[in-house]
Every structure is written in structure tokens, then in C-alpha cells.
Amino acid sequence: MSALQELSGITGKYDSSVVDHFENPRNVGSLDKTDPRVGTGMVGAPACGDVMKLQIKVGKDNVIEDAKFKTFGCGSAIASSSLATEWIKKKTIDESLKISNRDIAKKLSLPPIKLHCSMLAEDAIKMAIKDFLDKNKPSP
């Protein structure tokens, strides 16, 4: 079943915020991964086939200036990615690391069978931050 088929005409099954983020995803796209200010997190869930790439661009004082995502997966995975990028923009790295899959799942009212989507978003945030920090380690 495609993501569109999954969400199409089933208003009672998914919260309106999931449908909104699916139909109008925020921050879709890519950043230049060769830019030292950009961190990339790529995660996947083999059980359902969802793959999520989330990128951050970090500026002064470790504040995330921009965030982009590309997700191949269900509507809940797309909505989780979209919401995650909205939440981390203008936050510091430390603030962004505090965002949990539970926060994302609660905001989107994800059903239990879709909680792995919010876990992917949390993991992608952490991996993007780790990639950024690894790129910017001080030289010995």
C-alpha cells in the first residue's frame, strides 16, 4: 500500500497533524553534505522498508540554522521527518538531542503500530548531530 493510499480517505484513523505533515511536508530536500556545517543522518527500518535521511546545518553557537529531509516510507514516517525538522530548527544541538520519539509520537498521535516511525526520526536527528560533530572535531 502506498503512503497516499494509506492516508487517503481515512480521517478517523490518523490524527489531522499526520495528514497535514504528509500532504504538506516541511523542509523536504537536501543540503550539501560536503559542507563542514552540515551533518547527515541516514536511518532505516528493514521491517517496514522506511528509509529516512535527515540533514542539519549548524551555525554560530551550535544553533541548527536549517534542516532538510528525504524519506522513503509510509505517511507516518514522512510526517515524523517533517515534524522533526520543524522542531530542531533554531534549537541548539543540546536542545535537539532532548527530542524523543515519544515527543514526536505524542504530537502526531501515532498509533502503536507506527511508533517505529518516530523512533527513526529521533535516531536520524542523533545521527545527523553525530556526523556534524565528527566532521568538526578539533585537530590534535
From Swiss-Prot:
Pfam families: NifU_N. Disulfide bonds: none annotated. It is found in: Mitosome matrix. Keywords: 2Fe-2S, Iron, Iron-sulfur, Metal-binding, Mitosome. Pathway: Cofactor biosynthesis; iron-sulfur cluster biosynthesis. GO terms for molecular function: 2 iron, 2 sulfur cluster binding; iron ion binding. One of its GO terms (biological process) is iron-sulfur cluster assembly. One of its GO terms (cellular component) is mitosome. Scaffold protein for the de novo synthesis of iron-sulfur (Fe-S) clusters within mitosomes, which is required for maturation of both [2Fe-2S] and [4Fe-4S] proteins. First, a [2Fe-2S] cluster is transiently assembled on the scaffold protein ISU1. In a second step, the cluster is released from ISU1, transferred to a glutaredoxin, followed by the formation of [2Fe-2S] proteins, the synthesis of [4Fe-4S] clusters and their target-specific insertion into the recipient apoproteins. This is Iron sulfur cluster assembly protein 1. It comes from Encephalitozoon cuniculi (strain GB-M1) (Microsporidian parasite).
